[in-house]
């Protein structure tokens, strides 16, 4: 596909502050190649939603140009992430404001007060479309916040809602057991079905979980698996940036393990379907945190001489594994860890460009 014809969708996974930084590295590559201007749709989950929300907050509620991102926004975001322990701030808000109830709502308050994420979806630029993905406890479906839609098909949609960005982001990051649900009072809003007809909400309260429970990639607003795969109308090339941790060996019995196993299997199935779709159509990249260049070459069944050619240019196997093992947390990282994770996100898209050159000049 020619570069000038690209309508890029970004599906950005969850994974706490690690995911936020990894995705910033992906955006850095796009900016260096003047491709941010061709991003038409961003779909985000959990830590990725925090990343995108911070990006808008630090750029006057507009999506940055490639030049703005490189010269101003990325350095500003780095400083913010390094200097603010968001996890600590959220705990303080949970103790003093919510008495340890509604911890997801405490995250929203911390995002607003300490990261400066304020305003609602009507305040951000119309392009690209930004979909913040959550999971509805009541319906079991993916619940979406964006500039043009709030809701899910099973519960209904909010009409003319300028939903606060910080609250949508916090709902997207409300992991079960650890944080709990984000609660929405449905009564103040006017609800409608898909056709726009007015309906009454099915309950007075709606509870939203981390979008990763349903789809940790945030793929569904951009890519659907029906009919051998299809993109939404506003996208013809999708970059799936997966900064989630793979499931690992665990002998200790915990109730959260069933969530880990279920979400891991869902992610594997979604990844297989997406990879098959983009390989057939040459219209996307799948980036996986923790994979070094030689592993990408090997999995693609390419000549390993390609890996040897660049072995001194990219992060080592050990460095990539360090990124993969970085904990899922909202604590501020060290500058060394920030730079390492950022570089892995940046290099991951270069790996794919070298192995699968789907974008023509």
Report the location of each language-model feature.
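Structural recognition of the beta-strand scaffold that forms the well-ordered cores
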Residues: 9-11, 41-44, 131-133, 207, ...
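Non-catalytic peripheral regions of patatin-like phospholipases
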Residues: 60-107, 147-150, 198-361
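Solvent-exposed alpha-helices and their adjacent loops that cap or buttress functional pockets
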Residues: 2, 121-126, 199-201, 231
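Patatin-like phospholipase
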Residues: 3-11, 16-107, 146-147
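Flexible loop/turn segments at secondary-structure boundaries
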Residues: 17-20, 49-52, 139-141, 215-217, ...
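Extended, Lys/Arg-enriched charged tracts that mediate electrostatic binding to polyanionic substrates
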Residues: 105-122, 127-128
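Active-site gating loop/helix substructures
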Residues: 18, 89-92, 97, 125-225
């Amino acid at each position: 596909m020619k570069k000038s014809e690209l309508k890029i969708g970004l599906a950005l996974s969850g994974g706490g502050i690690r995911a936020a930084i990894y995705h910033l590295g992906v955006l850095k590559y796009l900016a260096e190649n003047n491709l941010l201007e061709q991003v038409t749709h961003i779909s985000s989950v959990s830590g990725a939603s925090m990343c995108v929300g911070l990006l808008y907050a630090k750029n006057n509620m507009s999506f940055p140009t490639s030049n703005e991102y490189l010269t101003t926004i990325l350095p500003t975001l780095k400083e913010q992430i390094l200097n603010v322990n968001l996890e600590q701030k959220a705990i303080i808000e949970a103790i003093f404001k919510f008495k340890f109830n509604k911890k997801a709502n405490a995250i929203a308050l911390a995002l607003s007060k300490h990261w400066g994420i304020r305003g609602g979806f009507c305040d951000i630029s119309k392009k690209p479309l930004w979909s913040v993905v959550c999971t509805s406890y009541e319906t079991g479906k993916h619940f979406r916040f964006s500039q043009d839609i709030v809701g899910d098909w099973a519960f209904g949609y909010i009409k003319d809602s300028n939903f606060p960005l910080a609250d949508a982001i916090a709902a997207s990051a409300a992991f079960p057991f650890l944080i709990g649900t984000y609660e929405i009072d449905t009564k103040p809003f006017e609800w409608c079905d898909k056709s726009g007809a007015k309906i009454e909400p099915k309950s007075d309260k709606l509870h939203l979980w981390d979008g990763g429970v349903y789809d940790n990639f945030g793929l569904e607003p951009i890519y659907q698996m029906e009919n051998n795969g299809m993109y939404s109308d506003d996208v013809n090339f999708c970059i799936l940036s997966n900064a989630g941790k793979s499931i690992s060996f665990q002998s200790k019995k915990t109730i959260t393990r069933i969530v880990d196993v279920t979400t891991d299997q869902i992610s594997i199935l979604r990844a297989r379907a997406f990879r098959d779709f983009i390989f057939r159509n040459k219209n996307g990249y799948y980036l996986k945190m923790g994979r070094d260049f030689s592993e990408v070459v090997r999995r693609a069944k390419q000549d390993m001489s390609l890996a040897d050619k660049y072995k001194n240019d990219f992060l080592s196997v050990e460095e990539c594994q360090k990124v993969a093992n970085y904990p899922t947390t909202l604590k501020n990282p060290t500058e060394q860890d920030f730079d390492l994770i950022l570089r892995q996100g940046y290099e991951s898209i270069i790996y794919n460009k070298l192995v699968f050159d789907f974008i023509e000049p």
